[in-house]
Amino acid sequence: MIAAQWKIIGNSTYIKKEIYSMSWDVDLKQQVSVGSPFAGPIAVMRDSSKFVEMNSQNMKPYLKIFTASGDLISQMIWDSSKNIVAMDWIEKERLVIVLQNATVLIFNVFCEQMTQFSLGDIVREEEILECKIWSDGIVVLTSASQLYSVPSINDFFVESGRVIRLPPLPEEPKARPEWAILEPQFSLSQSIEIFMSINGTLYLIDEDKVESQLEATEPIQKMVVSPCGKKLACFDTKGTLLILKTDGSTTNPDRMDTKATKSPVLKWCGSDGVMMYWDSIKDPILFYFSKGDSWAKFTLDQPVSLVTEIDGLRIISDTTSEFFHKVSDVTIDIFKIGTTSPASILYDATDHFISKSPQADESIRSINDQLEDAVNDCILAAGFEFNGGEQSKLLKAASFGKCFLENYNPSQFVTMCRSLRVLNAVRHHEIGIPLSIKQYYHIGIEELIDRLISRRKHLLAWRICDYLKIKSDVVLNHWACTKVRTDIPDQELGKIIIKKLESVPGISFANIASAAYLAGRSKLATKLLEYEPKAAEQVPPLIKMGESGLALNKAIESGDTDLVYLVLLAMQRSLPLADFLELTFSKVVALDLLISMCKQKNDFPLLREIYHIKDQSKEMGNIYLQEALSSHPSQLDQRIKAYNKSIEHYHHSKDKDDQATSKFIDDQIKLEMLQKELETNLQDESFVGISINDTIYKLITMNQPKKAQSIRSEFKVPDKRFWWIKIKALSIMNDWEELMKFSKEKKSPIGYEPFVEVCLDQKNQIEALKYIPKITDILPKIQFYIQIGYFREAADIAFKEKNFDLLNLISRKCTNNEILNIIEQMKSQIRR
């Protein structure tokens, strides 16, 4: 009877049930063992601090990983020179081992090293005093009384991991401080927080600050945070267990005086209570404490290893694995001795129905109003059971009860049946994942599938996916990636993988091909990539495998120019130039894109090579010209050489425009040589490379009018352009006298408006007034007068021209009343 196994502790009911008879041959008394939560594997290693009788089995130190049922998953010989300071599991069932030299090693369940990193030279030099590992990080305390934190181990898998130095301790510890970690998901700061007992005071330390939490009367020897993150169990030097709140709101903590002189192993049982374990005495004992007077003692006949779960505690010994947890309310309602709950009556009614007793009908009638609740309770109770027979009885009771209900929604019943079928499959001794229903709902089906495939239980994972009607591509992908590391011949293995996966949607053949290539199976990898439907996934592995031609074909077929560019860049880096160009010239699209890429990157040598092969003189000329213009002005010899090469290729072209271009380049050579001469004579290195206009302008501003005139004559600069350049330069120099002289040399070919404009640009209205009268066009002359505020002069011109519209324009701009009156008089006279 189920209730016979229960133990009443305070106001709650608990049960310690055997889940497995362990398959291993392990003496936990001589081993260090750590179990992964959520029914995870157990890592075992010989305890180097204990004397062990040597035999053939333990001559060498081994790291062994077992399932929760004690089946060996993997093992490896451990290098005894690597001194371990901490070993524990993090999420995704990864085993973390921290060494004394500050090296961190990460292993999967097959003892395969996934990655490693260092905590840094400073940590190594200060020496690790103590280290604690949490679900995604590490915290170490050094001999220098300094804390260091790894906020995320997963970040080291993507090379973005970091080690943080935490604030210094608030006082020098007189003895080694005890501490516990509050994980980020439970802290207000959303980063790790550390509870540390130093000299009788409890402090809270985060990445930025240290705060005092509690003035304790006795130093704390052990402390541990509950799975929910809300409670902190502390065991002090007087043998008292205290339960505090992590938010600092504790006023009257729950306590238990054990009178023990030695500190126990402290482990939470879910978040309900704390299990204390003393293994250093003749008969190991467990003490469970919840609150008030709620406690219980369990005497053991062998050492155990404890693993905290969110809803209980795994108690692992040399021979058994037990699960200690609180009995659910629905289970108590159904199986408690003397119970008359509706669910209990329904459960009994089912037995009566099976035995064809008329009492079944009476029982159903008696709970008719509460039948739906009874059905739901039986469904829930089935979920809490590990025994398949008891699950079946409870589900039969629920099924029997719902037959008498109209419009009952069976979704809860169906979901529970499916969940239990999955759970029973993974709980099987050969699989060894004894998840409770609460743990299963907490991690979710995706995480469970991930755990199965990481243990290479692909068939079971696939069957679960198929049963639950969820995507199985992840399972099959991992199966194939594992398969390529076997010794099956390439051709045979290729057929096996393709036959199995070809029709499965969402499969990434690229991932499998990459795994095959890493396993040294290039031919198999190439064959598998032919079945990858996505070109973006297909091309990069082909490049990595050196299949440049195939990669180029696939990239071109995809129509994705970015992919083609990717292949071209990879080919350029890895192939000899001749092979690269031969392969590229065989594909017109690739060649066009290569030319475009070279132009964007100004890769002139490669462009010259391409155009030389294509015998395109004009393009060769363009490249040499572009190369000359883009080279630095100080490299004149190089520029001239490129100009001459350009002319040489343009001469081979039959295009008349190219012949004209040759003449322009000749002039450019002549100009740059003159500019170089100017740089030498004037000791100014900023001439070469600028235009003719800029050269003349610069010479004028440097008071070199004769040299400017010489350049003008040499290159036949038109009068209009020269006048524009000179008046601009003289105005910038504020050489108004020279500007006036220049305006009188001869009639201006550009008129006198530019003279006014440059004066006004320099905000010199007085000089501008000298040139406005010389303007012949009436409108610009009036506009300039308006611009500088000479409204009367503007009005006189408009009146002289008898232009009524211009007078109106002036009056709109003018604000002087006297002048406005004059303008009105002028307008009156014009009207007459």
From Swiss-Prot:
MF terms in GO: actin binding
Superkingdom field: Eukaryota
Keywords: Endosome, Membrane, Protein transport, Transport
Gene Ontology terms describing biological process: endosomal transport; intracellular protein transport; vacuole fusion, non-autophagic; vesicle-mediated transport
GO cellular component terms, A-Z: actin cytoskeleton; endosome; endosome membrane; HOPS complex
Bilayer topology: Peripheral membrane protein
Entry-linked Gene3D superfamilies: Vps16, C-terminal region
InterPro entries on file: VPS16, Vps16_C, Vps16_C_sf, Vps16_N, WD40_repeat_dom_sf
Subcellular localization(s) per the UniProt record: Endosome membrane
Role: May play a role in vesicle-mediated protein trafficking to endosomal/lysosomal compartments and in membrane docking/fusion reactions.
Family: Belongs to the VPS16 family.
Name of protein: Vacuolar protein sorting-associated protein 16 homolog
